[in-house]
From Swiss-Prot:
This is Serine--tRNA ligase. Keywords: Aminoacyl-tRNA synthetase, ATP-binding, Cytoplasm, Ligase, Nucleotide-binding, Protein biosynthesis. It is found in: Cytoplasm. Catalyzes the attachment of serine to tRNA(Ser). Is also able to aminoacylate tRNA(Sec) with serine, to form the misacylated tRNA L-seryl-tRNA(Sec), which will be further converted into selenocysteinyl-tRNA(Sec). PANTHER family: SERINE--TRNA LIGASE, SERYL-TRNA SYNTHETASE. GO terms for cellular component: cytoplasm. Homodimer. The tRNA molecule binds across the dimer. The keyword Nucleotide-binding applies. Belongs to the class-II aminoacyl-tRNA synthetase family. Type-1 seryl-tRNA synthetase subfamily. Pathway: Aminoacyl-tRNA biosynthesis; selenocysteinyl-tRNA(Sec) biosynthesis; L-seryl-tRNA(Sec) from L-serine and tRNA(Sec): step 1/1. It is an enzyme of class 6 (ligase). GO terms for molecular function: ATP binding; serine-tRNA ligase activity.
Length: 443
């Protein structure tokens, strides 16, 4: 969330940042609400101060036996007791209005972020590896999985509907191996601490990382059975729990409502979890295969750090995610996202796009990881702070990245390591996790 003081100090810069996001200027309307809020707070504080002073003056008047003065002051205090709740309510309402408006506005991109309105404005940063040459036409992962008999979308549809999959035997084992390999890499070589977090979280936790209020329709929600028949819609919204769309939500919020010792920073956390996304805006897109699922597995990387270190931490996080694909010997490219294509909470984002030879007409790059620095944007929403060099609390900076999406890594491995007979060669780095198995083939 944005700092209203920063907007007050430089409204032109704020509006310029919003323009790069494709948004209209908002500083004037925000500052008008802020002015009302400050005036209401001042009026409430002045009324409280006057009530305190008048109460003291009543005692002085009574000591001086000035009953008329005391009666006048008592009447004033009685009137203030009536008006003060109204003033406090007005101040609270203005504060809530400002918070509501600020909470729906995305983060401001760094100056170095390229301009652009969508993915067409993204800029290639660098490329790793090369496309492989096959002596046959590479197949899509779902064709490979169906032929093996280990990828069943029909069974999943019977259980849960569209955008789910049942993996079996060698492919189920391969997906598990990929996730374990990623976790081991990040914890043993990259210095991340493994966390096993809750998958169901409160509204305020979703708010903290920016899923609420703007992206409510993209989430899956769980409610207690006793609430199903409740006519109280507000109670439903208050008591519901959200299924995490990414472990970023749980991991980042571990710092919420805390003042950390900066000696503890950077705090680097990782988790392998199922993730759940309603994909409300994805109707008709990627309907085939495992590319876009309602439920998928992902290894998440989160860093909590100081303002001075956050930019360097982004480069480090990107490198950690890249090493997953390098060790799997997968061809990929890194893209710097343009301002119009970045996520809501991000100041700068790198996307890693892995080459999938079975996709499209002759193969295509598909996103497998996003690494973002968010500055203090999420920290303000969570009230996550650290004690700085001067001993005063200040907001931490947060970063998050996929390290990486396990399902998409499975797809990339299947399509990259497919053999002409439809079997899948197991990358050497994964073979220890597969009991030494070198090839996945049909029983």
């Amino acid at each position: 969330m944005h700092d209203i003081k920063s907007i007050r100090d430089n409204p032109q810069a704020f509006d310029a940042g919003l323009a790069r996001r494709g948004l209209k200027p908002l500083s004037a309307s925000l500052l008008a609400i802020d002015e009302r809020r400050r005036a209401a707070i001042l009026a409430s504080e002045q009324a409280q101060a006057r009530r305190n002073a008048a109460s003291k003056e009543i005692g002085d008047a009574k000591k001086a036996k000035d009953e008329a003065r005391a009666a006048t002051l008592m009447a004033e205090v009685a009137e203030l007791k009536t008006t003060m709740p109204q003033l406090e309510a007005a101040a609270k309402a203005a504060d809530e209005e400002l918070t509501k408006e600020l909470s729906a506005i995305p983060n401001i991109p760094f100056d170095e972020v390229p301009d652009g309105v969508d993915e067409h404005g993204n800029v290639q940063h660098h490329v790793f590896g090369n496309k492989r040459n096959y002596g046959f036409a590479p197949k899509l992962h779902d064709d490979l999985g169906n032929a093996l008999g280990y990828m069943d979308f029909e069974a999943a549809a019977k259980l849960s509907g569209a955008r789910f999959v049942v993996l079996k035997k060698g492919l189920a084992r391969l997906e598990r191996a990929i996730g374990q390999f990623m976790l081991d890499l990040h914890t043993t070589e990259h210095g991340y601490t493994e966390i096993n977090p809750p998958l169901l979280v409160r509204n305020e936790v979703m708010f903290g990382t920016g899923q609420l209020p703007k992206f409510e329709d993209d989430q899956f929600w769980a409610i207690k059975g006793e609430l199903l028949a409740s006519p109280d819609h507000e109670r439903l919204k208050t008591e519901r729990l959200g299924l995490i769309p990414t472990a970023e939500v749980s991991l980042t919020n571990l710092a919420r409502e805390s003042i950390l010792d900066e000696k503890q920073l950077p705090m680097r956390l990782t988790a392998l979890t199922p993730c759940f996304r309603a994909e409300a805006g994805a109707a008709g897109r990627d309907t085939r295969g495992m590319i876009r699922q309602h439920q998928f597995t992902k290894v998440e990387l989160v860093s909590i750090t100081t303002p001075e270190a956050s930019k360097d931490e982004l480069e480090r996080m990107l490198s950690c995610a890249e090493q997953v694909l390098q060790k799997l010997d997968l061809h990929y490219r890194v893209m710097t996202l343009c301002a119009g294509d970045m996520g809501f909470s991000s100041q700068k984002t790198y996307d890693i796009e892995v080459w999938m030879p079975g996709q499209g007409d002759g193969g295509m790059f598909r996103e497998i990881s996003s690494c973002s620095v968010c500055g203090d944007f999420q920290a303000r929403r969570m009230d996550a702070r650290s004690r700085g060099p001067d001993g005063k609390p200040r907001f931490v900076h947060t970063l998050n990245g996929s390290g990486t999406a396990v399902g998409r890594a499975l797809i990339a491995v299947m399509e990259t390591y497919q053999q002409e007979d439809g079997s899948i060669a197991v990358p050497s780095v994964l073979q220890p996790y597969m009991g030494g198995l070198k090839v996945i083939s049909r029983d």
